């Protein structure tokens, strides 16, 4: 098995939306650049000091890529605030909130600030539960209320119940805080109710022992979690899961963008389904893009029963078997519906992308996996070593991915939780010690137009078969055998250029290329 080193992969976001069928008319396309990954430095905030490293660069491309949709961080606009409130450890809540007579507590300032105003929290430590709820005014889209930490302002656990920062009002911006949970079993930040336009940005959340650093629940709608460093949330008892971000049932339209989330005992992001504990409707409308996820005890992203999820342009790596997990990087299971996984870089794991498996109720439907780069997936330490695995699901589409340097590139139809119904697998570069391991439960499989390494084995119902036998039993008359010969930034070889079939994604040239990277734009 080959190992790839460095930043080889590319990221492109095609224009097609979540569609259960991708076989629409494709088109020639112009290319574009891709957004940077992970936390970007912002002066005078805790993320200004985050060490720069190559994993924050945009995923490399040999040329511009068609259909890019991932949204880059925008530069902070200059704002003229209508009033400034000042909070200081040396202040007094009886003051007028000016620089000369600052307030003592953040909560007092929260109760006073109005649309278009800013609360400047001076350097120091504030042991309080910050509640932006019935005590606070709502901002407006044109005049948000900003809660600004300055000089490393630090929030630690204070008296009261619930998360350390509780957001229940729309159009508030929480910016630039060190939120230190001090190993207590608490959420760092919670969003609930109508929080449209409310944002947690440019902050460092660390060292918690509760369910997550950030959570959305109780019909939380429209929250944005952007450009934060989230790390060190660990539980060592009970279910041992302490996640970076948990999106709970009834949440809607949540965005998780450009965060670094790592070294937690749970997942970087989990969309939690209601199965097993609730009759509430699932979360709907989750966007996870441009993040850097690595080194958790569990997964990078875990999508349970949630609807309308987009996971794109993320870099995810360093997930190996642990005492509580198998080393899967990205998991979509239970009754997830309409989930788009595109343009991600996934490497150094025990399994790259897994669809199906655990089941409670209907199987996953409308899952689209496209233009991902999955490589260096290993069975070391007891891992499975699978690039992409499809189990119980219906209509899963796997197109234009590059799967390289794996123990087994693709597994389908082994019956875990039920059949892999009507999967579509086209235009993929497939390389592994075992290229494809196909079980007996993949009714309606459409397999073709893939470039498959000649060095890999084929398995059918657990038995090694010849390539010709495999193609005959699967009806694959269009896949070709050839070395991937991947070049700089995972550019495909001539065997893959213009050799794909139109699956509804924009392309450049006479026909789509096979694999995740499109040349010629």
Regions found by a protein language model. Give the residues of each.
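Bacterial N-terminal signal peptides
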Residues: 16-27
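Surface beta-loop-beta hairpin patches that serve as ligand-binding interfaces in beta-rich domains
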Residues: 59, 67-75, 464-521
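Detector for repetitive beta-architecture
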Residues: 84, 116-118, 129, 144, ...
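Acidic Gly/Asp/Thr-rich repetitive segments characteristic of extracellular carbohydrate-active
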Residues: 89-131, 513-516
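Extracellular beta-strand-rich solenoid/capping regions of secreted or surface-exposed proteins
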Residues: 107, 111-115, 127-146, 154-197, ...
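Predominantly extracellular beta-rich ligand-binding scaffolds that present long acidic/polar faces
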Residues: 129-131, 142, 340-346, 357-489
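Extracellular beta-strand/beta-solenoid scaffold signature
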Residues: 131-135, 158-165, 183-192, 208-217, ...
């Amino acid at each position: 098995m080959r190992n790839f080193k460095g930043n080889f992969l590319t990221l492109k976001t095609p224009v097609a939306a979540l569609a259960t069928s991708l076989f629409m008319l494709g088109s020639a396309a112009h290319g574009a650049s891709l957004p940077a990954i992970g936390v970007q430095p912002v002066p005078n905030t805790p993320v200004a000091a985050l060490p720069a490293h190559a994993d924050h660069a945009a995923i490399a491309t040999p040329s511009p890529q068609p259909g890019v949709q991932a949204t880059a961080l925008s530069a902070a606009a200059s704002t003229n605030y209508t009033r400034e409130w000042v909070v200081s450890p040396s202040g007094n809540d009886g003051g007028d909130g000016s620089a000369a007579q600052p307030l003592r507590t953040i909560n007092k300032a929260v109760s006073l600030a109005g649309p278009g105003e800013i609360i400047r929290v001076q350097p120091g430590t504030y042991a309080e539960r910050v509640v932006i709820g019935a005590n606070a005014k709502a901002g407006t889209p044109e005049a948000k209320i900003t809660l600004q930490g300055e000089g490393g302002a630090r929030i630690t656990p204070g008296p009261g119940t619930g998360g350390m920062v509780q957001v229940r009002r729309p159009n508030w911006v929480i910016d630039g805080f060190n939120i230190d949970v001090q190993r207590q079993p608490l959420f760092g930040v919670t969003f609930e109710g109508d929080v449209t336009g409310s944002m947690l940005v440019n902050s460092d959340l660390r060292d918690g022992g509760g369910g997550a650093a950030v959570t959305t629940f109780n019909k939380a709608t429209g929250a944005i979690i952007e450009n934060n460093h989230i790390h060190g949330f660990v539980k060592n008892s009970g279910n041992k899961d302490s996640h970076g971000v948990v999106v709970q049932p009834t949440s809607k339209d949540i965005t998780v963008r450009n965060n670094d989330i790592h070294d937690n005992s749970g997942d970087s992001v989990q969309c939690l389904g209601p199965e097993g504990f609730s009759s509430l409707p699932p979360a709907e409308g989750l966007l996870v893009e441009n993040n850097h996820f690595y080194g958790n005890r569990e997964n990078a992203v875990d999508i349970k029963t949630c609807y309308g999820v987009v996971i794109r342009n993320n870099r995810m790596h360093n997930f190996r078997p642990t005492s509580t997990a198998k080393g899967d990087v990205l998991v979509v299971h239970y009754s997830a519906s309409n989930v788009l996984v595109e343009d991600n870089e996934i490497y150094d794991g025990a399994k790259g992308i897994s669809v199906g498996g655990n089941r409670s109720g209907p199987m996953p439907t409308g899952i689209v996996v496209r233009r991902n780069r999955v490589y260096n997936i290993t069975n070391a330490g007891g891992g499975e070593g699978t690039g992409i695995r499809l189990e119980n699901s219906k209509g899963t589409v796997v197109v234009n991915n590059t799967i390289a340097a794996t123990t087994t590139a693709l597994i389908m139809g082994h019956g875990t939780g039920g059949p892999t119904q009507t999967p579509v697998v086209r235009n993929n570069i497939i390389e592994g010690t075992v290229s494809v391991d196909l079980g007996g439960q993949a009714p309606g499989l459409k397999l073709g137009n893939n470039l498959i390494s000649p060095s890999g084995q084929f398995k059918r119902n657990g038995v090694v078969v010849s390539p010709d036998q495999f193609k005959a039993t699967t009806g694959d008359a269009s896949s070709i055998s050839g070395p991937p010969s991947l070049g700089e930034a995972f550019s495909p070889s001539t065997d893959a250029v213009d050799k794909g079939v139109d699956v509804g994604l924009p392309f450049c040239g006479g026909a789509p290329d096979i694999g995740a990277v499109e040349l010629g734009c």
